[in-house]
Amino acid sequence: MCIRDSIYKAAKEIPIFFSANMSLGINLLCELAKTAARVLGGTYDIEIVETHHAQKTDAPSGTALMLADAISSELERKPYYEYDRHLRRAKRPHDEIGIHSIRGGTAVGEHEIIFAGYNETIKLSHCAQSKELFAAGAVNAAKFIQNKEPGLYGMSDMIDRKDAKK
């Protein structure tokens, strides 16, 4: 049984809170990106640029993939994720989301989503300035699921119920 299956099984018995990122801000960015994807549809090229400290070993980050998955869920045609465009010499296909990872210095985490359209570009971004915000998000999540019925909960549940700061 994989971890995800174990989580779903346990959620039948107890409340479980899961998020790839415990920052309220990054999860709000995720919701904004879903709205942008719904409104703009397949008419804009989409790119995600993420920056983290030099010690981070995974690329792209789980948060970048979470953002890409959220955007993808709102598009009619499911895009593929392009991580390494420099090897392919061709025009950009329309059915992709480019994901670019930068590693350096001590950056906690920065994510920018670019919707590039005809004669305009829309950019949505989030910059984590301290890891304290992830701890605060975890504490808020613990408070949120306190006394909840068994089930799988996430940041979108907190955002939807406006309980994020309680």
What are these regions (language model features)?
Residues 42-166:
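C-terminal substrate-binding/catalytic lobe of Rossmann-fold NAD(P)-dependent oxidoreductases
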